[in-house]
Every structure is written in structure tokens, then in C-alpha cells.
């Protein structure tokens, strides 16, 4: 449900900020799985922006390589989602 998704994101990103320094790869992987799931379910620009906001957080945590993999993966998987591709370009500028 949408409510449990919000809760899951809040928990994941809240705890990740404390753990990312000591366990970067584990945190990047958890975040990547969550972002992947969200992107698969996203249907409009508002939701694509949320996906990209999470990608930008990953970059802030030095997860550039993971963010780049996800951006490339989403571009290949969803070539017809023009609004998503548009939002992903904004993330790419920060990589």
C-alpha cells in the first residue's frame, strides 16, 4: 500500500544516514532495491520525481556508481516513459 511504502522509505533513508559511512555497499544495495521497486510502480512525473530524489540522496552518500547503474537501467527498461527520461537527465547532471 502507499502508506506502507512511505513508512518503508522513511525508515530506510532515516537509518541509512547513520549506517552509510560504515556499511556503504549494503546501504547502496538496499536503497537500489527500494528505488527499483518504486520506479517499476511509478506512473507519472510526480512519482518519477520521487524516484529521482532518492537517486540524488544516493549520490549525496557517495553512491554515484549505484545511481549511475540505476539511471542506465531505467533508461533501458523504460525507453517510452518520456517524463521519466526527462527527470533522469537532471540526475545525470549531478553524477
List each language-model region with its residue ranges.
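Short, small-residue-biased leader/transition segments that mark boundaries at the very start
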Residues: 2-7
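Structured C-terminal portions of repeat-based eukaryotic scaffold domains
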Residues: 8-60
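C-terminal non-catalytic interaction modules
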Residues: 35, 43, 49-95
Amino acid at each position: 500500500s502507499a502508506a506502507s511504502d512511505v513508512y518503508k522509505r522513511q525508515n530506510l533513508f532515516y537509518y541509512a544516514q547513520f549506517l552509510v559511512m560504515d556499511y556503504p555497499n549494503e546501504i547502496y544495495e538496499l536503497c537500489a532495491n527500494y528505488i527499483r521497486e518504486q520506479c517499476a510502480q511509478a506512473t507519472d512525473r510526480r512519482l518519477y520525481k520521487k524516484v529521482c530524489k532518492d537517486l540524488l540522496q544516493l549520490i549525496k552518500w557517495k553512491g554515484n556508481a549505484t545511481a549511475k547503474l540505476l539511471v542506465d537501467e531505467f533508461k533501458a527498461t523504460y525507453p517510452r516513459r518520456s517524463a521519466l527520461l526527462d527527470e533522469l537527465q537532471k540526475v545525470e547532471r549531478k553524477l
